[in-house]
Amino acid sequence: MSFISKLFGKKEEGMKAGGMEDFMTLIRVYFQAVMASDLGITNLAALPDLRVFKATLKVPTQNNKLGLAEKSRCRKMLKELYGMDDNFTKEIDASIRKRCKKIQDVQAYMYQFSGFSQDLMMLTGNLMKFKLRVPSFFKSAIYTMTQKTVNDIFNKNDFNDPAVMKTVVAIRQYAQKLGFSQEWTTNFVYKVVMLAKKEPRTKNED
């Protein structure tokens, strides 16, 4: 977890947005902070990303309740470093509140999100492969492409490749279980796509 320490080991005011992995780590921290505050979880060992975040940034516990201050700090970082607005985090709040009623629900929820995000990134990368060569400064065009791709994943039923259709069905099931909207999914994928475009390409890539 050295990358998380590198991300959180600077003064917050001087932080710069990291890569895709750093963004996904902050998403997990936010999930765990919401779960801690909503479910009254006090054992930080059960929330590894939140534990590192809290210790490295020295976030004090608010009102003797784990998760409140950490959630606020993480939301601020997602907004300032990655441009994720309040609607993005509010949808996470609503999803977790509705689907995690007890501590035992946490593991299943995180497993579902892991499957959702992995399938989503793999499929969008496949469907947008050539479009992703568009330079990063064409942000509006890339967002429109992402929006169309996510719309197809949510609504199109005539994919020719059976493997693609199988993954589409799995993503729709995950989205329904997690309660994430098409708009939330579009914004999530767009941010990951833009961060991925900034990362060094491997030698075998065109």
What do the predicted segments below correspond to?
Residues 2-60, 67-206:
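Small-residue-enriched hydrophobic alpha-helices in membranes
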